[in-house]
């Protein structure tokens, strides 16, 4: 008979970790996601495309190549790395290594200056590529911890909390950058300092470049609860080199057997396109808007703050829909509706909406941001898009 005081089982069938253990796990995503939100979506990538490269179209092309290269590298290496980690048993060493790489790379973003001075354009792309690959590998090993530490009936809550912490961290850091570095000296509000803090020079785009070091500090700080309080898998005792050989051998064997398991093969291909599609959509959100509407850092920060808040609302509603409809149906609704809204987003230009309908470019209100009708429509549509996409982001497995 099972003891009334026995630990609840995890999805892996082993005793789950204590609440401190699995709740501390959520800080890993809270540490990691603000980098993605600030650097990739809203601030640094648009700065890189428009100001470092100096040509939004060419900049977007380079970012597209960057994402494609990172995707290829991950497609070729992630299965082997996962198998190696399974053979060795431990995930934390991988998380430590990738977080250190990301933090060093994020700090280096400070030296990527306008016009390709400082670190040049192509060395900068290489740094961003290394960070992107390390980010994804960190995500793989961090997520791999979840099934073995979380009670089965807490999986939805824990994954949703991790997603929310990531967005909360992004909102807090963007708000700090907005009030401390971007708005001072540009608008006469009594609660703002007269000049950007710490001598940040807006003319040199230091308020764009500072987001890398800020994200690095945040990442290092909030990864600590995972390392200190979340239990790692037990070491198998297999030497690293033997684990690598066995892991590679298992992956090759599994790939050879996929022809007998067509459903699994279809799932893996679908998952690859699903994840790559989400990454592409999120990456180009701020880059596309900044290039199309000539939005600066302050405007993008406001967009990011509101959109991240909308994403949290969508994630909360998505969790409720999970309970009512099931996760598969919720995921289907999320993907279908976000795809429809995405078509609306890309149909908006400064002087047209829905591809064909002409609109005036004149301001429709006195607020200094999002002044034209098309800008307001893009802003509003972005909120709807974030609400529909976020339930899919809560479920990395389709």
Regions found by a protein language model. Give the residues of each.
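Central cavity-lining transmembrane alpha-helices of secondary-active solute carriers
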Residues: 63-83, 104, 171-174, 305-317
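Juxtamembrane intracellular "pre-TM" segments in multi-pass secondary transporters
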Residues: 5-23, 231-269
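Helix-to-loop junctions at the C-terminal end of transmembrane segments
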Residues: 76-90, 313-327, 353
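Glycine-rich segments within core transmembrane alpha-helices of 12-TM secondary carriers
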Residues: 159-185
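Short amphipathic helix-loop junctions that connect adjacent transmembrane helices
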Residues: 37-61, 280-303
């Amino acid at each position: 008979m099972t003891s009334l005081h026995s630990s609840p089982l995890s999805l892996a069938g082993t005793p789950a970790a204590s609440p401190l253990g699995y709740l501390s796990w959520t800080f890993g995503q809270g540490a990691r996601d603000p980098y993605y939100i600030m650097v990739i979506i809203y601030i640094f990538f648009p700065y890189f495309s428009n100001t470092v490269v100096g040509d939004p179209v060419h900049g977007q092309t380079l970012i597209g190549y960057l994402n494609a290269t990172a995707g290829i590298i991950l497609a070729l290496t992630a299965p082997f790395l996962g198998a190696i980690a399974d053979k060795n048993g431990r995930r934390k060493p991988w998380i430590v290594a990738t977080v250190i790489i990301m933090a060093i790379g994020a700090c280096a973003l400070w030296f990527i200056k306008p016009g390709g001075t400082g670190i040049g354009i192509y060395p900068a792309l290489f740094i961003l590529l290394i960070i992107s690959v390390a980010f994804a590998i960190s995500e793989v090993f961090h997520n791999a911890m979840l099934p073995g530490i979380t009670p089965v009936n807490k999986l939805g809550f824990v994954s949703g909390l991790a997603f929310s912490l990531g967005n909360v961290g992004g909102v807090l850091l963007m708000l700090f950058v907005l009030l401390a570095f971007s708005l001072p000296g540009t608008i006469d509000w009594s609660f703002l300092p007269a000049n950007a803090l710490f001598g940040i020079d807006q003319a040199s785009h230091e308020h764009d470049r500072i987001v890398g070091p800020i994200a690095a500090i945040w990442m290092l700080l909030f990864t600590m609860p995972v390392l200190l309080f979340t239990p790692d898998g037990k070491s198998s005792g297999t030497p690293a080199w033997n684990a690598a050989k066995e892991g590679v051998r298992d992956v090759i064997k599994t790939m050879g057997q996929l022809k007998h398991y067509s459903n699994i093969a279809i799932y893996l291909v679908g998952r690859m396109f699903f994840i790559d599609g989400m990454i592409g959509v999120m990456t180009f959100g701020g880059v596309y808007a900044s290039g199309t509407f000539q939005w600066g850092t302050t405007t993008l920060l406001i967009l990011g703050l509101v959109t991240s808040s909308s994403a949290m609302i969508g994630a909360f509603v998505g969790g409720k829909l999970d309970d009512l409809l099931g996760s598969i149906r919720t995921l289907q609704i999320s993907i279908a509706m976000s795809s429809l809204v995405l078509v609306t987003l890309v149909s908006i230009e400064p002087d047209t909406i829905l591809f064909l309908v002409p609109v005036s470019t004149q301001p429709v209100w006195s607020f200094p941001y999002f002044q034209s009708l098309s800008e307001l429509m893009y802003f509003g549509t972005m909120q709807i898009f974030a609400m529909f996409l976020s339930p899919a982001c809560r479920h990395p497995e389709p």
